[in-house]
């Protein structure tokens, strides 16, 4: 039997009373462990800086904000790692654009997830954002932990930058922006895959959008990306926890109290820069041997699109693996 196969009689062997949610089930049952063994060389939880400080920061709940590499596995493995080490089971934010089929929506709602509604008109979008902001504040006031990516959708080029729109959405419920941010207790997390199984799909999407700015992914495309991300080879995978940004915010505001009076967009830029610096410093740096060029060519060969521009696609594939290195170096300058 393949590692990732599940037999019904094995499922029945579990006492249902132990399984509070599907998230508990996925962690208790060895499906995530099987995916890890089959598609990686290990999934590791690590720390940037003082581990005791980080553990103190997350003790009473935290807002885990990460870069975004994979639609499914980013949050799935983080949940497993936090659950196994700290008995933390974060609520997970997921965009409704991924509900390609009804079964996905049902699974998501059972899996301690909340929905980030996208694609509505301007007025509806604002109302949805206000409701979500109030819900997140409620969760944090209850001491619950939360996961959300730093941006809407994956960074196709791996240039991981926090979107101010995400930060704005999170802080609509409340009056003082900086105090709203501190209430969230944002603990950035860096996710680094040695190899991105969706790299060739992302490169193809970039050319398709270049050739036709109105091009959009279909539901079938999203499901294919989810499937590829789950089953594709990833090499070594590292999740690196970093300290709460509240420490830097307190120091910054003590030194520059005038920042409380600057326009909101400038305040958001300041906070985004802190989050980005944490994530960039937390990257795992992998050595790329002489066979990396051959790897890129093998990924290029998988791309099957009209008017395939190999030079452009090759450049984008290299860019995906170069940008984290560039940002890592800049973060330490």
Regions from the language model: what does each represent?
Residues 82-90:
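A short alpha->loop->secondary-structure connector
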């Amino acid at each position: 039997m393949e590692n990732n196969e599940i037999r019904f009689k094995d499922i029945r062997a579990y006492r249902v009373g132990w399984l509070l949610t599907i998230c508990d089930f996925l962690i208790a049952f060895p499906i995530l462990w099987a995916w890890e063994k089959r598609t990686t060389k290990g999934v590791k939880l690590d720390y940037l800086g003082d581990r005791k400080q980080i553990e103190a920061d997350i003790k009473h709940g935290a807002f885990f904000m990460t870069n975004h590499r994979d639609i499914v596995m980013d949050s799935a493995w983080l949940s497993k790692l936090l659950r196994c080490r700290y008995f933390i089971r974060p609520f997970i934010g997921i965009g409704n654009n991924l509900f390609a089929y009804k079964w996905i929506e049902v699974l998501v709602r059972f899996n301690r997830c909340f929905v980030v509604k996208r694609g509505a008109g301007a007025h509806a979008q604002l109302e949805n954002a206000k409701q979500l902001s109030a819900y997140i504040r409620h969760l944090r006031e209850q001491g619950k932990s939360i996961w959300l990516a730093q941006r809407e959708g994956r960074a196709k080029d791996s240039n991981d930058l926090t979107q101010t729109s995400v930060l704005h959405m999170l802080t609509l419920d409340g009056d003082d922006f900086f105090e709203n941010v501190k209430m969230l207790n944002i603990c950035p997390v860096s996710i680094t895959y040695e190899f991105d199984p969706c790299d060739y799909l992302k490169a193809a999407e970039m050319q398709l959008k270049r050739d036709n700015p109105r091009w959009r992914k279909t539901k079938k495309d999203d499901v294919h990306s989810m499937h590829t991300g789950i089953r594709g080879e990833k090499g070594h995978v590292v999740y690196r926890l970093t300290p709460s940004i509240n420490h830097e915010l307190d120091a910054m505001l003590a030194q520059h109290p005038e920042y409380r009076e600057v326009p909101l967009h400038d305040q958001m830029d300041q906070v985004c820069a802190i989050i980005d610096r944490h994530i960039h410093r937390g990257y795992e740096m992998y050595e790329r041997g002489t066979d990396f060029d051959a790897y890129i060519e093998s990924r290029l060969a998988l791309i099957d699109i009209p008017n395939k521009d190999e030079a452009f696609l090759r450049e984008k594939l290299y860019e995906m693996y170069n940008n984290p290195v560039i940002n890592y170096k800049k973060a330490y300058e």
